[in-house]
Amino acid sequence: MATAKLISQKAKAHAPSLSQATTAEKNSVLQAMAQQLKADADVLLQANQLDIANAKKNGLSDHLIDRLLLTKARIDAMATAIDHLIELPEPIGAVKEEIKRPNGLVIKEMVVPFGVVGMIYEARPNVTVDACTLAVKTGNAVVLRGSASALHSNKAIVHTLKKAFQNSPIHPDVIQLLEDTSKEEAANMMQLKSTIDVLIPRGGANLIQTVLQEATIPVIETGVGNCHVYVASSADPDMAFDIVVNAKTQRPSVCNACETLLVEQSFAKAHLPALVERLSAKGVSLVGNEGACTLDPRIAQANEDDWSTEYLDLRLAIRVVADTNEAIAHINQYGTKHSEAIITESLAERDTFFATVDAACVYHNASTRFTDGFEFGFGAEIGISTQKLHARGPMGLKALTTSKYGIYGEGQVKE
């Protein structure tokens, strides 16, 4: 079985065939990828069923199985996302800034690929497609290390995507999958600074912390999503109910789902029981602080851990707060800097919330479920960054590029 060192060397060796490719050549490969995913759908579903069977046998939770599952509709959605990606402007080669110096030198800041991007991620075979297609569009080779639970799916997907290079000058080895899913080989991959330019972990808190602690390669941190919705006193009740129910139940197993609901006390007294009725009808189990529990007996007492837990399930923590300042303080204490929403008719409250909540994405009168590269018009995403350097929020094409300075002279020398 090939090692991380060997496959990263292959990726780096063939990266120039991609970084020097034309827009038409890259888009042609992407178009072939979309078509091949649809053509190989049955093969992909069969491979995925092996992973699903193993997941059930190994006792994986329902939310992890949902993340692992491929369906015909999900494969079609992947192909559609590639079609949108093709339509996006070419991200490489643009001049971000041009400066002419008094000595006649012209300095241009140009957008270029990283070179080789490494991905370490859990479950979610769709990430394999997103990573490969975004890498092709941005001219980056990619080294993938998925989880053992998705190995059959990932191998089948990579095999399918590599067929798209058949009639292309771009070498198929710009895509590499590490099939050895041992922790030891993952640790080896994190040390390959000479062949991998940037490393992006995508998964649970333990995975991300392990990568941050062990990697010598520069890391773009993607965070877990302990997301909040705060309902202020002036919120429209119908709007608030719709947003909260959507943010929690539309797909509870993903990182942009709401995990804690904060409700201003006067709104809670008037409307919390009706909101609990809506949530309970969707199968959501509820825990809360004393202020919430006294308003509805269906809310069980929360413990301290509930406020910092990413449930990824039909479970919601509810806290009744005195005002917007208390809600903001709670979010900044327990949040993961991912996605936070306020429901209010007060523009002053909105502006305060936006200015003081520390998160990659802040929402006014909308569900947190929109934190997604496709929803933002990025075509796809390689992750959602919760750090502040290089990239923040959904990472699309721009996040997979860096700068190079071209200096144009006519014989100038330094005096």
Curated annotation (Swiss-Prot):
NCBIfam families: PRK00197.1, proA. GO terms for biological process: L-proline biosynthetic process. The gene is proA. The keyword Protease does not apply. Catalyzes the NADPH-dependent reduction of L-glutamate 5-phosphate into L-glutamate 5-semialdehyde and phosphate. The product spontaneously undergoes cyclization to form 1-pyrroline-5-carboxylate. Keywords: Amino-acid biosynthesis, Cytoplasm, NADP, Oxidoreductase, Proline biosynthesis. One of its GO terms (molecular function) is glutamate-5-semialdehyde dehydrogenase activity. PANTHER family: DELTA-1-PYRROLINE-5-CARBOXYLATE SYNTHASE, GLUTAMATE SEMIALDEHYDE DEHYDROGENASE. Its EC number is 1.2.1.41. The lineage of its organism: Bacteria, Bacillati, Bacillota, Bacilli, Bacillales. It catalyses: L-glutamate 5-semialdehyde + phosphate + NADP(+) = L-glutamyl 5-phosphate + NADPH + H(+). Belongs to the gamma-glutamyl phosphate reductase family. CDD domains: ALDH_F18-19_ProA-GPR. One of its GO terms (cellular component) is cytoplasm. This is Gamma-glutamyl phosphate reductase.
